[in-house]
């Protein structure tokens, strides 16, 4: 998906609330060597601002397949986002996607990580590292960004009191801003963002760019420690 088609989506899909499913491949910075002109890091923000648009960002092959089935059965416009990089297939093969319902992957008490897309895998690795240091992460897989599972977000943060949001997207318009706004209204807590801060991408391998832009598991670990210092 490029910005050039956003007006068509707004006028022909969003405004009419038509039953159209938009499947966007190669989203985010990990498109890699194609560089900034091909790396879409603002798409979630653009799509979730459209009234009535459902936005889904699955984390692996199994969840993508389940999300595709759920989307086909859903009435109304949907934006389904796919990444390019290969990630381990860690979700159960028979696990269904319920649109608007987050999945708790790890139970914890110290900090909540809300992750979406393939950064869920990075968050799993970060949680394992942190557990070895005595920090217990609650990891929530936010496959549906809109409608956000507000109940799951508030309940988790009320328990842990600290938040890290991880996504392959700009801070502006992304999951992190959405979560922070919800918490400001209902359950104030310190929040750190593992996302891209107001800049375009560049050419490089996916792994190089993940590290350069602070989206890898090591960056999530650092953000967790930073937010814990603010509790």
Give the positions of each predicted feature.
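Conserved thiamine diphosphate
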Residues: 1-112
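Thiamine diphosphate
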Residues: 31-32, 84-231
């Amino acid at each position: 998906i490029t910005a050039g088609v956003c007006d068509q989506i707004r006028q022909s899909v969003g405004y009419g609330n038509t039953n159209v499913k938009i499947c966007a491949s190669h989203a985010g910075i990990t498109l890699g060597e194609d560089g900034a002109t091909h790396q879409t890091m603002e798409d979630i923000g653009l799509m979730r601002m459209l009234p009535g648009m459902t936005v889904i960002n699955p984390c692996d092959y199994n969840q993508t397949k389940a999300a595709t089935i759920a989307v086909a059965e859903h009435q109304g416009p949907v934006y389904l986002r796919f990444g390019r990089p290969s990630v381990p297939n860690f979700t159960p093969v028979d696990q269904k996607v319920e649109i608007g319902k987050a999945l708790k992957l790890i139970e914890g008490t110290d900090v909540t990580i809300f992750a979406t897309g393939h950064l869920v895998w990075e968050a799993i690795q970060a949680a394992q590292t942190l557990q070895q240091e005595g920090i217990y992460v609650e990891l929530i897989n936010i496959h549906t960004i809109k409608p956000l599972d507000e109940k799951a977000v508030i309940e988790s943060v009320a328990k842990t009191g600290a938040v890290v949001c991880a996504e392959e997207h700009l801070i502006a318009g992304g999951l992190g801003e959405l979560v922070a706004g919800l918490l400001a209204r209902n359950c104030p807590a310190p929040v750190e963002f593992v996302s891209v801060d107001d800049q375009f991408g560049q050419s490089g391998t996916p792994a190089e760019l993940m590290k350069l832009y602070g989206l890898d598991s090591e960056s999530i670990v650092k953000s967790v420690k930073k937010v814990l210092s603010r509790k």
